[in-house]
């Protein structure tokens, strides 16, 4: 989907804003300074190449990226390698896994000078200096409007609806143990059903639920709305923003998000403890909060910028709302029970 408004926004922002923020270091030319910033991300990270090139030109640093996997894999790898860090800075730790990373002292404290006021609402409970919120979105079930119209079937609305016989063999989600959207969906079911969440998953399973490894598998392989993929599932786990990327020439979207099924996801970045280039890592964090990057996030990563002063693409206003009342689970409960919930899910749902 073309987003001309976003392109114009990015161009304007590039013309008038420093990409590395007010705290950017002098160009890294000294022999004693590292000249590479190693960035560790999840495998859905993407930004406009022109922005990355501009960061390198302005700071003198060379960016080097690695992506161990999805959000859950990213955090696991950061923990396993914390004594010999994979990089200098990491992006893509979400609120489901943040407590685990903080408990393992993976990150060093750093608060960007230009942290937007709106970011305060997404600070990690109890330790906002180690992780900086970068973007936010809602993980929700999505539906293929055309499929339901063709089959003369009402679209589901709630989590309960997904267990009804009318929707047997129609739903696909990603694995909570391997995928951050999958984990967000697990948390949504815990927030909605409390201690009955396992029974809910068992009803889903009995109704033909399909579980795959990653969000990419869900959306680009199994979802019927994916172009040319031959998917067979018209109900798929994705984001509330996904319908903004399936807009037709007449301005309508072929898909929709079920806003009563959503769990709020916040993605963070942080300077890795023991980083070889902490100054470069800090500069990259400042860069992620700069206006050009925040404006680029919607079109590249399906997420809302954490800076609420950034203008959104017009398509998002019409087709990509955040849920007015997302399902929630207290952060303290996630931190205390996440491993237990995942073990229970593995034992009683997957078997």
Predicted features along the sequence, with ranges:
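Early extracytoplasmic/lumenal segment of secretory-pathway proteins
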Residues: 18-21, 28-100, 221, 227
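Periplasmic-binding protein-like
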Residues: 167-177, 287-312
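A bilobed periplasmic-binding-protein/Venus flytrap-type ligand-binding module shared by bacterial periplasmic
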Residues: 142-147, 190, 265-280, 288, ...
